[in-house]
Design a protein with these regions (language model features):
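Short, charge/polar-rich alpha-helical segments
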Residues: 1-26
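Long amphipathic alpha-helical coiled-coil segments
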Residues: 63-83
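Acidic, low-complexity, intrinsically disordered interaction modules
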Residues: 38-64, 70
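Short, charge-rich amphipathic alpha-helices with coiled-coil/heptad character
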Residues: 1-9, 40-42, 47, 83
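Extended alpha-helical coiled-coil "stalk/arm" regions
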Residues: 18-49
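Extended rod-forming repeat segments used as scaffolds/tethers
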Residues: 19, 23, 57, 64-66, ...
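Surface-exposed polar/charged interaction patches
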Residues: 13, 17, 34, 38-41, ...
Length: 83
């Protein structure tokens, strides 16, 4: 596998990773909202919600890191494919 093929593969992997983070972000956000509405009086669920909030922030940060790396890979591909 040459550099171009490696970068193309890496770009696809980063896009999949970004999507995975987004699915988790969406799920955590919905779960937090659901707990706030339906289980606000349950201490165990509030504790779970608080852990979800921490995980949500962590996934947002990790997604941003992945976006940065994806963009750098895309820039390299553009440079390599330019005439």
């Amino acid at each position: 596998m040459n550099k171009l093929e490696t970068l193309q593969s890496a770009l696809e992997a980063r896009n999949d990773e970004i999507l995975g983070y987004q699915i988790n972000i969406d799920n955590y956000t919905r779960a937090i909202d659901k707990i706030n509405v339906e289980h606000a009086d349950n201490p165990a669920m509030i504790e779970f919600r608080d852990r979800l909030i921490e995980m949500l922030e962590s996934h947002k940060t990790e997604q941003l890191k992945t976006i940065i790396i994806r963009d750098v890979i895309a820039d390299q591909l553009t440079e390599m494919e330019a005439p």
